[in-house]
Amino acid sequence: MKVLVILFGAMLVLMEFQKASAATLLEDFDDDDDLLDDGGDFDLEANSDASSGNGNDSNDAVPEKRRACADLRGKTFCRLFKSYCDKKGIRGRLMRDKCSYSCGCRG
């Protein structure tokens, strides 16, 4: 009986470790700026600089720029990792949760 309890506890610990490591892996991909090599950032910076004629406009452009970059990063991320959408297991579930809005993963 003790052996079963120990094995069950070890299994739970390994499952939690796998979830944590998969989540940190996905966070690293989400925050990686190397995925944005298509030059999209330069256009966004030019637009925010062009609208800085008034002092208030430049402050409003910063959140809009961040939102646009996040959308581009999400689409690029999902395009690269769409193969995980149909997989079973923790990575498939994380991918469906992460990018169901843009890459068509069905939950």
Swiss-Prot record:
Its main location: cytoplasm. Induction: Transiently up-regulated (6-fold) after challenge with the coral pathogen V.coralliilyticus and dramatically repressed (50-fold) thereafter. Keywords: Amidation, Antibiotic, Antimicrobial, Cleavage on pair of basic residues, Cytoplasm, Disulfide bond, Fungicide, Immunity, Innate immunity, Secreted, Signal. It comes from the Eukaryota. Residues 37-46 have a biased composition (Acidic residues). Residues 37-62 are annotated as: Disordered. Residues 47-61 have a biased composition (Low complexity). Disulfide bonds join 69-105, 78-99, 85-103. Residues 23-67 form a propeptide. The modification Arginine amide is found at residue 106. GO terms for biological process: defense response to bacterium; defense response to fungus; innate immune response; killing of cells of another organism. Residues 1-22 form the signal peptide. Is specifically expressed in the granular cells of the ectoderm. One of its GO terms (cellular component) is extracellular region. It is found in: Cytoplasm, Stress granule; Secreted. Belongs to the coral AMP family. Cationic peptide with probable antimicrobial activity against coral pathogens. Shows in vitro activity against Gram-positive bacteria and the filamentous fungus F.oxysporum (MIC=1.25 uM). Gram-positive bacteria tested are B.megaterium (MIC=20 uM), S.aureus (MIC=5 uM), M. luteus (MIC=1.25 uM), B.stationis (MIC=10 uM), M.maritypicum (MIC=20 uM). Has no or little effect against Gram-negative bacteria (the coral pathogen V.coralliilyticus (MIC>20 uM), V.aesturianus (MIC>20 uM), V.shiloi (MIC>20 uM), and E.coli (MIC=10 uM)). Has no hemolytic activity against sheep erythrocytes. This is Antimicrobial peptide damicornin.
